[in-house]
């Protein structure tokens, strides 16, 4: 009967994992409100395991969905297949129906065979809380052939846990470590044939002892199924043991005894061997363990759910109660995983340290590594403490002696790897530049990789992180060491360099992905307001994707540029009472002191601040610009009396008259107060504390003029300006703009438009000059030789803005209405050119040579503050 103990080729065992070929043919789902064509796929899951879940490709069909795709699955004879038919949509997928297949029932009904078997499954779907029929799904199964004779009575399979077996004598069947040549089954797997002895196996549980009370006290005879698999005390494969009903199974439940099952221990997945039982007449051990050698009495801890056992011949194997499998190899330590590279070689992944190794890890290996790492960390800490034993410990007192003073609110200074950087907790960003020196008005920024520091004596020096050197010499062009803390010896302005520095800050702080803004042209303002204010400020740094509802198109930048242009035209429209024109004939905008007529005006100003910051951050332009004093306020610069001339000429002339005349001789009684009317309500504001009783005299006249000028720029707009700057600072920190002056900021926000030279010359008028005068010819020659940036600066120098109205130079607006570009002959040849922005007039002295005119003109448009600096 020796042949009876060998497994038959091409026959699988009920609990052996094998490959199943599943062919998904077609489906006829019942779908309400059916679309003409459906894009669908089928998802198949084995026993609900994510690792055994596969999908077909997507196919398009109408009444009948066709796939004809083959899927290979790893199953056992008791596996359950869950099939789901999905319909693909743009936003989400829709479940058309589900079906399930119990392979054990299929095998029972077909004599243990699945050879190209066709199944038509009824799909089920949920409709209003009830399960209804959802159509049909046709599949083919081609897979394992299971010998049902190994099961008691030759019929039913068990429900999922491998059951132990006993021979006819009642003694346990245990394997012997003598191997036979392997045979190949029909699924490509390999099964080994071994001889077994009748000795019982010893058990060494790793997770604790089982209570004897949990065991059944009733013995049941084992029915002979007629199969001679237990003849002469031998069974197929390894390691297989038998158990008595009194002995609990390895999964902790008592089940009827079953026939012996083949098990193939391997590093992957195997069947679960049952625990051994004592011989007839012996009482079971209450501890479930036997005396082991000293080396085995204190084994290394196994992962949860694992157990170590030993065969009679002394060979150790391991039981995984989680997956009900056995293996010869000891389980990996926690956090380790075994993988295979493309060349079929095994390697091991340590998820704890995110490292890989070819060597199989053991508990001793992990302990040695942890011990080495602990010693290494202790040694590094000791070395760091040793290297810093003579260093001066930093404290809060050191910041008190910092020549630059304390950091701005919300900023923190840190140092990693020897280099200092700064953290802005307000915007959650970091930077190398010191915010106290970044963008100083009198100093341009340091070159990339440079840093400014101070010695304990307060002497400034510079660190070049590129070459790791230090120097007292200022690396910026035109700066001399030790001259006024680095004030420029020769003026050097590069708007292009500043702009690239700003763009670098924007790109280095950009966030991934994109943000969608969907608006309608009819409700552009409100749609944009609601969406921008509902977003987190930092999300507005993501790439913009603008959608115009009702219009088809993809936004690759063009729609965003149009959105900025259209929305800026809306939000800055004076009809909303948020902004007003700076003057009757000045098309630049300033905040309207009467904006409080709108109860939500501060929220709108916060929104506009975010919007303007987005325009700068994303490099887009707006339609209309602000006044230069407003740009100065954004840069935290103090407006001057000269700035008042362009926005309120009458007020400016009044202050100039007070400045140039003796108030005591004129008999004027002025006090440090000023009246203001808003919406018909007159309010009085004190320029200084107790100003109502302080009279203006010749001694305090300068203070009065300064306070009056400041009040004129801030009257009634303090809250609005703060809300605007808060919204701006949420998206882009205002510190990033400190490199620029107010005119450069206007250029960056409003854009640099191309200038038509022929239109400029044709629309220019002359006073005390003619177009044939040599100074005029030299002037136009210089302008033609300029690049577009300098032409814009010349236009800004004369007209006060870099933007041209619709219609070009012929439509320029002055203080008294339309005013063309004018060149007037004024002054001596030693004078610099002067401009009158209210009248679009350039005072050009009669220079004697082309070189002199070019030098004076270029110097004037660069140095626009203060005249007569020869």
From Swiss-Prot:
Residues 151-299 are annotated as: Disordered. Changing residue 498 to R: Does not affect FBXL15-mediated ubiquitination. Keywords: Host-virus interaction, Nucleus, Phosphoprotein, Repeat, Transferase, Ubl conjugation, Ubl conjugation pathway. Residues 300-333, 330-363, 405-437, 444-477 form the WW domain. Residues 290-299 have a biased composition (Low complexity). Activated by NDFIP1- and NDFIP2-binding. This is NEDD4-like E3 ubiquitin-protein ligase WWP2. It comes from Homo sapiens.
